[in-house]
Every structure is written in structure tokens, then in C-alpha cells.
């Protein structure tokens, strides 16, 4: 008689994805982030669900309801800060996961990669709308500034913005619909995650060498289940340290001031995980150009499979490409720093140079360096 986990239709699904899944024997800790992202999503959905039980999406009471959650609801402050800092953890894992994909050439699995880009966009949209919900100063002005960018679209721009707002400014209708979409999107993300895994399990995982590992596979359980549990433990510990010791470290103090349409904060800036894109947006003086650069800064990832000129898949044995990759990482950190700075003399030019370098590295320098490495292989 066959084992129930291999014969039962439902258990078979779980078995094929988490237990008997053949996995390369040499995947490193950089392959942990997929499962960590799954845990982040679960934490966000659960904490978000309980927060939604106490939150009211009305402009007059939204800020007050968040205060009520923190003061009067049992462990409401834990829920609120787990949710807010959980988003930061989510993005840290996302960036590391994408970085791993770039470094080891995982983008060669184009379907998995493209669904991943869709997921990145969906998570960014969810995070943006979630930031609006507490209805503080930065919530209101962030929503106003970012939605206003759509007015740069020729002909339909202004109508589109007013349609999204549900009026002539960010108001009750905007907050209500953002809450509705913020609640809905994580479930769409969950569905996309299933599609992402479906495509991944068609090809199997990549590994650090970038060489096919079909002849040397091991079962996912117990080897990688225990490895993932260690990663999860470290991440949850880091999240709890953040939540319990410095919950407001990554937030903006302006968001503790209730939204006031008559008073603009001195520096409008998004959460830290959007600062790199915000810096690229600000570095172009033209509105439409800035919006296009903003979208392309993420969409450019879809070109990675086309820009792969190397004969090797992974960067593991390509020192010149490694230099380019780490230069890209340093450039993104520079952009993140610039995004949080005021628009003043030294920062403007640094932001513009960093933006030019970002696109140059991905579109020109990395493919060129790969061609040079191919030539070096012939020597």
C-alpha cells in the first residue's frame, strides 16, 4: 500500500512541493529567501487581518483608530508594529531574493522570473497603499504626490488621477478604496506565489554553480526544511528585536501628526524601501521622464534574460561580472541614501549620476563585461 502522502490528492500536492521535491545538493543560504518571503506574507496577512478588525477607513476616524489599536486593544501595539516592520522585513528578503537571482543567473527561467517581477510590483503597490491607511501627514502627502505622478500620462492623465482619487483631491473615497485594495492584494499575491512555484517546479531550482544538477539531487525534506527553519528563526528573531526594541526606527516621525491638507511637510519621502526608485524619479527634471524612469527602474529586470551575454549562467566563476554586480549594489544603496535627502546642491548631482550609473550598469556595462569574459575563456 502506498503512503497516504503520495496517494491522497491534497497531500500529494504538499508532498511534491515540500517533502519529496528534488533539490540541488549544493544550494546555499541565498536560497532560503523564498521560504522567508512566504513566512513574511503569512505574518502580514495574519497581523493585517487582526488590524482590519479594529481599523476604520474613514478620514475622520482612521488616525484615531490606529491610536486606539496601539493603546486599547490587547497587544494591539505588537500587531501594529509587527505589521509595519514586517513590511520592512518583507522588502529586505525581496531585495536579497532578487539579488540572488541576478547573481546566480536564475532569470534564465524566464516564466518564474517574470511572475516574480509581477509579484514585486504587486507587493510594492500593496505597501504603498498600506502606508496611506494610518492617515498621518506622510500618508496623506505621500498618497497625493505618488498618485499625482499619473497626471504626467498624456491626454488621459488628469482624468485618471481624479478617477483614482474618487474626487478632486485625496479624500474619504481615496482612503476607503486604498483600504479595500490593500486588503485584497495580498490574496492576489498569494495566488501569484502559487504560479511562481508552479513554474519553478517545472524546471527545478538553479544552484550556485549555474550548472544543471539533475544528476545530483536530494529530497527537500529533511535537508532543506531544517535549513529553512533556521533561516526563519533568524529572521523572526531580527523582526522581534526591531518590533520590541526600536519599532519606530524605520518609520517617519511626521506620520504621528494627523493628516492636514493645509500643511505640507518639509520633506515628503516614502518608506525606506522605495527611496531608490524615488531618487531615480527625482533625478529627472521632466515629470513624464521621471515617471517612466521610475517604472523602468523595476521593469528593467524583465530585460535581464535578453541581456545575458555570458557563456556561463552564474557569476560564481566570473570575477569581472562580480565587480559589476557589487557596483550595482553600492549604487542602489547610494540611491536609497539620496532618496531620503532634501533636493539640494550636492544631492541632486549625486542622484543623477547614480541614476545614470544604475541604467548603464544593467543595459551596457554588465553585458559588455560578460562578452569580455567570454573572450578571456578562449585564452
UniProtKB/Swiss-Prot annotation:
Keywords recorded for this protein, A-Z: Electron transport, Heme, Iron, Membrane, Metal-binding, Mitochondrion, Mitochondrion inner membrane, Respiratory chain, Transmembrane, Transmembrane helix, Transport, Ubiquinone
Topological type in the membrane: Multi-pass membrane protein
Sites where the protein binds heme b b566: 97, 196
One GO BP: mitochondrial electron transport, ubiquinol to cytochrome c
Record: residues binding a ubiquinone: 201
Transmembrane segments annotated in the record for this chain: 33-53, 77-98, 113-133, 178-198, 226-246, 288-308, 320-340, 347-367
Gene3D superfamilies named among the record's database cross-references: Cytochrome Bc1 Complex, Chain C
Subcellular localization(s) per the UniProt record: Mitochondrion inner membrane
The protein's role, per its UniProt record: Component of the ubiquinol-cytochrome c reductase complex (complex III or cytochrome b-c1 complex) that is part of the mitochondrial respiratory chain. The b-c1 complex mediates electron transfer from ubiquinol to cytochrome c. Contributes to the generation of a proton gradient across the mitochondrial membrane that is then used for ATP synthesis.
Complexes and interactors: The cytochrome bc1 complex contains 11 subunits: 3 respiratory subunits (MT-CYB, CYC1 and UQCRFS1), 2 core proteins (UQCRC1 and UQCRC2) and 6 low-molecular weight proteins (UQCRH/QCR6, UQCRB/QCR7, UQCRQ/QCR8, UQCR10/QCR9, UQCR11/QCR10 and a cleavage product of UQCRFS1). This cytochrome bc1 complex then forms a dimer.
PANTHER family membership: CYTOCHROME B (PTHR19271:SF16)
Protein name (database record): Cytochrome b
